[in-house]
Amino acid sequence: MKRLILFAGMVYLLISCAGSPGFKDGKGDMDWQLFRGDAALSGYTDTPLPEDPVLLWSYKGNTRTVSSPVVDKGTTYWCDKKGHIQGIDIKGNPAFSYDLNTAVEATPMIHDSILYIGRIDGFLSAVSLSKKDTLWNFETMGQVSATPNTVNFEGRKSVVFGSYDNFLYCVDARDGFEINRFESGYYLNGAVAVWKEHVIFGGCDSWLRIINTRTGMPTDSLLLDAYIPASPAIMGDFCYVGDYSGNIYELLLEKGKIVRHKKIMKSTNENSSFVSVLSITSETLYALSSERYLYSINRKDGKVNWKYLLKGNVGESSPLVCDDKVIVCTKTGIVTILDTQKGTLKWEYDTGEQIVGSPAIIKDHFFVLTTKGTLLCFGNK
């Protein structure tokens, strides 16, 4: 049986009545509270990158991490593998420190000044950034490596996340009590994408599933050609996802159903795969392949606008589109910025350390976190 542990002094979150993803509410230009920027995991922001970025400062956390950085009110947070949550302010000074005292391999989510994070020991923890205290822990029977997401419905703000115990959980954000759950049949490793009152996720069993968060019941599913290593990305009523054999799929969604689907890009190489989350704009799809190419793909006809060969091994870091530029990191440690129209190289920086997480973007700054726990802040000269 799942158990919920509450802590004295717990504060309640503000609850708003809505029927849509919760990440649009109150997000300021100094916030990047989810690793893809929004609950749909679109990987798009209209916040422009610095025109001529330079390294403003770096902070060495000195403990390995696989997290992406998240930002709340200008302070950047992450958790290392030993369970130490760190917060560094916009000037590069330590501003927050909290120990979970357990192993962590997940990227946190921040919402309403609460940091939510999964743990290897099977718990999802809610930590108050103002109180520096754990509000509640929700226990599952498997490790939680997926980044949580949030959705609003019926006046309740809920947190949705997957576990290695094969369940997708929806819990009340204010107290951690379980609302519902769905058994997928396979462990859940990636973040779910939120579309209206539904969540969409793929798994190692090659199924892409749509779940209604009100009921915890599936509304539709689609079997892909190979297993799905990364989260889907959503723009409007269109969902895009890549599989491990190198295909990219487009799905049109309506009332919780897949009304149409097609391969917008077919694999041409048996060694090709897509292991990072796609990025979407109104006209274009950006995909990072295991062959080290970043692709720009026309959403209307599936034609490749351009492709750019990156330096070194690409890893799991996902690209982000920032207005008219796209930023991407490689596992080798190279940060690259390209023009979205022609794929022209605009800027490049070698961190000298491996990167597996995605950047975080705020006004006039962006942040990159290496696997050694070094946080780098870039901005204008």
What are the functions of these language-model segments?
Residues 351-381:
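Blade-level signature of beta-propeller repeat domains, shared across WD40, Kelch, NHL, RCC1
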Residues 288-295, 307-337:
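Loop/turn-rich, solvent-exposed surfaces of beta-rich toroidal or solenoidal domains
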Residues 25-29, 36-39, 51, 57-70, ...:
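Extracytoplasmic beta-rich repeat domains
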Residues 33, 75-78, 86, 115-117, ...:
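Conserved beta-propeller blade signature
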Residues 89-93, 128-132, 172-175, 212-216, ...:
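Short loop/turn segments that connect beta-strands within beta-propeller blades
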